[in-house]
Amino acid sequence: TLDMVPRQFVYISSLSIFGPIHEDNYAPISERDTAMPNTAYGVSKLKSEHYLQSLNDFPTVIFRPTGVYGPRERDYFLMAKSIKQHIDFAPGFKRQDLTFIYVRDLVQAVYLAIEHGVRQRAYFVSDGNVYSSRTFSDLIQKELGNPWVIHIKCPLFILKVVSLLAEFSARCLGKVSTLNADKYKIMKQRNWQCDISPLVEELGYRPEYPLD
């Protein structure tokens, strides 16, 4: 038992707990879907959710954000750096639907949950829009004022080999690689749409920072 129960406990999980899903029809991931993570990161987040949900009467509210960007975010910074150098790499040839959330909109969702005293609830969080990988890179190019960029679609098997080699090399050097087996699985995933209507309808969430 927990002797000191907080008034409310907010846990930031991840959309990654659902793994690759609805990649045939690109339907938004919803709370009706079954979480089946395919990465160590997703598994750890799901286990944390299950633990919190197993605590009787523990006042938990869970957020499952899509890709979060903002100050000091590293992964998207590396992509922007590549585009600044006139190269844009897109994983695979099949359609990929991306979603994002600016950190301030995520904070808005958290504050709304606190204000409403939400308990035993889980919400998906995004800015409500869906972007193609090309649209995403074009927006970065425009923001950087880069006059031209070479767009390269990298076959997934090549990306997988490069990811595994980068991870192995980093381990040999006692370092952590940004590009690794887990990251490959995330980049490979085709559908990142999610249903934020419960967050909008129940808490009045209104995203203020679209990617563009």
Regions found by a protein language model. Name each.
Residues M36-V61:
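Active-site Tyr-X1-5-Lys
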Residues F18, V61-L78:
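Flexible, glycine-rich beta-alpha linker
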Residues L78-F100, V149-N191:
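Alpha-helical membrane-targeting segments
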Residues T1-A40, V61:
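Conserved Rossmann-fold NAD(P)-dependent oxidoreductase catalytic core, especially the SDR/UDP-sugar
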Residues A113-T178:
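Mid/C-terminal beta-alpha module of Rossmann-like enzyme folds, strongest
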Residues P91-Q96, Y123-Y131, Q141, K153-C154, ...:
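Glycine-rich Rossmann NAD(P)(H)-binding loop
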Residues V43, K47, E73-L78, G92-I114, ...:
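Substrate-positioning beta->alpha
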Residues Y131, L139, K175-D212:
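C-terminal amphipathic/interface module of NAD(P)-dependent oxidoreductases
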